[in-house]
């Protein structure tokens, strides 16, 4: 049952994190009449602009997080970022608060160690070889054992922060320092992984709903500086590899538990599939589903967490997204060229309405459909290139 917002019978959902992905979740919640409360560390974040009301707190502050949940008494608490005091969510779930998909899933996936050990050691899924390191001495030993090239990541970071590929062991100290600077906790434990010479990597959006597990068509993507630049759907792959990918995703999602959409990241090398990471929430590469599917990843997430069925997921055809990226410092961001960016058929834009920029920031995305994937990517890139960010 869903009541009208601002009434006694309202269904209240609290978003912990109000970026561009949270904004789309908020919009989908609004479409189904849910009262939305946005929470983030800064004012006027994208999802706050479409929420019924919002609060600014440090979500890593356990007392502040508990206080805001107790104040608002939401029926659903929906973490949309990793930088949250997850132990508080675990405690509050035990007290009866509904954490999406589960507090355990949120805590496990907040750091790479929890989810990697679950996937490799508990579920026995294929992954790259790895070591976790607390000191630079352990780090150097791990590099010697795994060999180069290898990948280094802070166990707690996002959007590529602190990640690097070591191709020369002489550069290990620089990689260690970069990882320490990029961690959300300001340094600490890192993972050293063997480099998988993959043919391609995918995001398999996997939905756990009241009527079972559902899969979106696989999404291919290109990364640069640890963050995505373009994504496309569907990624071409054999039936055998798709079946292996879906089997891995099902095991991970079922082990994490709860209802919702999960972004399962996988590497594909020949006929082999390797687990990489998982997010228990919509994934940035899944922004392409805003144009590629009848139900976007955000609509699917909301249906699932509200306990609603998903009869089918229709994919419209070859589609792509291309990031609108800017670099600079400003609290007065404007955009030119929007008309030119939308001249081609089957193109759309999403401008995230982020309030400011200080450095490099993703400010929007261009979306396109075409007769094949290459054409869709080209069209999305062309559309994105026409949007000029003015400071």
UniProtKB/Swiss-Prot annotation:
Q: Nucleotide-binding: is it a keyword of this entry?
A: yes
Q: Which residues bind N(1)-(5-phospho-beta-D-ribosyl)glycinamide?
A: 20-21, 80, 284, 354, 361-362
Q: Hey, which family's this protein in?
A: Belongs to the PurK/PurT family.
Pathway listed for it is: Purine metabolism; IMP biosynthesis via de novo pathway; N(2)-formyl-N(1)-(5-phospho-D-ribosyl)glycinamide from N(1)-(5-phospho-D-ribosyl)glycinamide (formate route): step 1/1
What keywords are annotated for this sequence in UniProt? ATP-binding, Ligase, Magnesium, Metal-binding, Nucleotide-binding, Purine biosynthesis
MF terms from GO for this chain are: ATP binding; magnesium ion binding; phosphoribosylglycinamide formyltransferase 2 activity; phosphoribosylglycinamide formyltransferase activity
Q: Where in this chain does the record put each ATP-grasp domain?
A: 117-306
* Protein name listed in UniProt: Formate-dependent phosphoribosylglycinamide formyltransferase
- Chain's role: Involved in the de novo purine biosynthesis. Catalyzes the transfer of formate to 5-phospho-ribosyl-glycinamide (GAR), producing 5-phospho-ribosyl-N-formylglycinamide (FGAR). Formate is provided by PurU via hydrolysis of 10-formyl-tetrahydrofolate.
Q: What PROSITE patterns does this protein's entry cite?
A: ATP_GRASP
The organism that produces this protein has a lineage beginning with: Bacteria, Pseudomonadati, Pseudomonadota, Gammaproteobacteria, Alteromonadales
Which processes are annotated in GO (biological process)? 'de novo' IMP biosynthetic process
Question: Which reactions does this protein catalyse?
Answer: N(1)-(5-phospho-beta-D-ribosyl)glycinamide + formate + ATP = N(2)-formyl-N(1)-(5-phospho-beta-D-ribosyl)glycinamide + ADP + phosphate + H(+)
Q: Which GO terms describe its cellular component?
A: cytosol
| EC numbers for this chain | 6.3.1.21
The residues that hold ATP are: 112, 153, 158-163, 193-196, 201
Residue numbers binding Mg(2+): 265, 277
The record describes its quaternary structure and partners as: Homodimer.
Which superkingdom is the protein from?
A: Bacteria
One Pfam family, short name: PurT_C
